[in-house]
């Protein structure tokens, strides 16, 4: 392997000649061969947005020449294009401030920017610390890149997937509004409900999650940049943070602002905890929806079988013809993982000692993973399951007509105790509810027909 020699304050080190990173990235690669979880590329793109904006801000403030500004902006745009992904090899499990990833970006930007200057025959050079990282510290850049990445992924990936599934459930809710089925509480028969009403509960869960997500993501718009090492802003111009936030907003289209309290921004990540709490709430709702779907689709002959779901693949390697609710199982596993991630994010956020929280990479990793899993999970569940849900009306009608809980409609006419006697007699003697009611003498056949109407029970008002 061909190498070149790079150096840092620790001395010289060999770096692969075809890679754009420098000495500090190479040391991190060697010092932290831990796990396979690479720093998400979205974080790198968040850094690129930041470094680009910082160059523009430093130029405005007279801290950087126009040539250096142009070179850094060019390098950052190259990163944002996705052309340089291979030059960001570091894992999540590194220093808790994310310093190595910050330097990885600084070194790659410096390398590409210097090529730009050379190509344009400009007699200047870019230093990763003195120029790319000017007016910055890893302590304020990593949380800034984290917020930029999280906000963008919620906007571009999670919210569209949430809307997609919500809209499908709304279509099913409207389509099945005339189908009356038995309701169930405590896993036992209850009073009737429309299939559309049942699905409306699922849909409304997603409506509420969409609102909660919209509210919680607003706090992610606050950026730590300008706080530098401990929140005081040492080595940065007083206007630097606001200018960087402005340029990030200009390039992304999102209204980022510089946090009004940088001490908080460096040592606490409660804004991410709140965001992930919403992800956990969404995971809980998806768990409930997926469980309901697979129970209602259980069978085909010895289960509830009130709905059918698409048959996407063989379900068993030993039982021919078996088809399993695999999309539901996928979504419930996603939900469990997100709930686990929430525990990590909450605990990691609590570990801000004095002026800095040093669990930033794991907070970032787990939150992004939750966003990816929920977004991909909802889209896949929607396309391969939800869109194909159909009622099995014969079974639905059979369960409804056999239910003893229709007796609830008699309460206002004969009282709770007599209605309970009718239900118990029917269950004990294997009678229909109508047969039991007439045999007790509490109601006539005409009264039973007038009072026991499932269509009235689902819309009592």
UniProtKB/Swiss-Prot annotation:
Pathway terms, separated by semicolons: Carbohydrate metabolism; tricarboxylic acid cycle; (S)-malate from fumarate: step 1/1
GO CC terms in record: cytoplasm
InterPro entries according to UniProt: Fum_hydII, Fumarase/histidase_N, Fumarase_C_C, Fumarate_lyase_CS, Fumarate_lyase_fam, Fumarate_lyase_N, L-Aspartase-like
UniProt-listed CDD domains: Fumarase_classII
Gene Ontology BP term (one): fumarate metabolic process
One annotated GO molecular function: fumarate hydratase activity
Keywords linked to the UniProt accession: Cytoplasm, Lyase, Tricarboxylic acid cycle
UniProt-annotated catalytic positions: 186 (proton donor/acceptor), 316
Cellular compartment(s): Cytoplasm
Database matches in Pfam families: FumaraseC_C, Lyase_1
Annotated EC: 4.2.1.2
Binding site for substrate: 97-99, 127-130, 137-139, 185, 317, 322-324
Keyword Ribosomal protein: no
Principal location: cytoplasm
Record keyword Lyase present: yes
Function: Involved in the TCA cycle. Catalyzes the stereospecific interconversion of fumarate to L-malate.
More details: There are 2 substrate-binding sites: the catalytic A site, and the non-catalytic B site that may play a role in the transfer of substrate or product between the active site and the solvent. Alternatively, the B site may bind allosteric effectors.
Protein name: Fumarate hydratase class II
UniProt source species: Staphylococcus aureus (strain MSSA476)
Lineage: Bacteria, Bacillati, Bacillota, Bacilli, Bacillales
Gene that this sequence comes from: fumC
